[in-house]
Amino acid sequence: MLTRIVLFAITNIAVLILASIVMSLLGVNPTQMSGLLVMALILGFGGSLISLLMSKAIAKHTTGAYVIEQPRNPSQRWLLDTVRRQAEIVGIGMPEVAIYEGPEINAFATGADRNNALVAVSTGLLQNMSQDEAEAVLGHEIAHVANGDMVTMALLQGVLNTFVIVLARVVGGFIDSLLSGNRGGGRGVAYYGIVLVLELLFGLFATIITMWFSRRREFRADEGGAYLAGRNKMIAALERLGINHGQSTLPTQVQAFGIYGGIGEGLRKLFLSHPPLSERIAALRMARE
């Protein structure tokens, strides 16, 4: 947790330094930026942190997942025992374990606290995977929790949101001044239109960065699953996903934390939260050699 906080602080300092450089190059008075920076920080981090704090409730509501309080059958008992054992190995609190209705093979983890997380699996996973394969998937999700990926993603999104808000308005003000010849600080309708376009453009690049980081996260979680369940089991689980994949039906709010995130070609690959299954399998096999 301390490492993530330090990284978060360093990244924010870098954003502020970059914003100061841009303002200096564009001739913007830094004293006029204090209000913008405060607004950007509030808006940039407000949404991502609120989403993080509410992530478990949102996930349960959007997927219809029900938490296993008392196991009703051997399958549910096995789920609880496996998650408990893996959580003890990595030194985190026992997550809530839930099942949600879904034909695809998938699972996800979420939560703002690594000691109070949620791990959920689809009914499709329980019906189509062997216990060895399911154990590896659970290990993958437990690795996400142990690595603090949900918190890291929220902090990254907050930093990028702040950057987009500040940069769009600084550059938008500069362009508006060039077009209108108005350097007195007053803003017309054109300024807000320019800012909107720039926010969409910079937001697109921010999404590409976020998804790139998410794909790196998945390789690390696969390694965690291999550690907790065994490398061969993790490879077999990913191969099973390749056979029985189909389009993910997870809601957008939790899709990035599923074991499977869909497929894409060309430029669409830049916006995928998960690497291709073939690359994930190859990475696991390469690490074994």
Swiss-Prot record:
The keyword NAD does not apply. GO terms for cellular component: plasma membrane. It is an enzyme of class 3 (hydrolase). CDD domains: M48B_HtpX_like. Pfam families: Peptidase_M48. InterPro entries: HtpX_protease, Pept_M48_protease_HtpX, Peptidase_M48. Binds 1 zinc ion per subunit. The active site is at residue 141. It is found in: Cell inner membrane. It is a multi-pass membrane protein. Its EC number is 3.4.24.-. Belongs to the peptidase M48B family. PANTHER family: PROTEASE HTPX. GO terms for biological process: proteolysis. The chain crosses the membrane at residues 5-25, 33-53, 155-175, 193-213. Zn(2+) binds at residues 140, 144, 218. One of its GO terms (molecular function) is metalloendopeptidase activity. This is Protease HtpX.
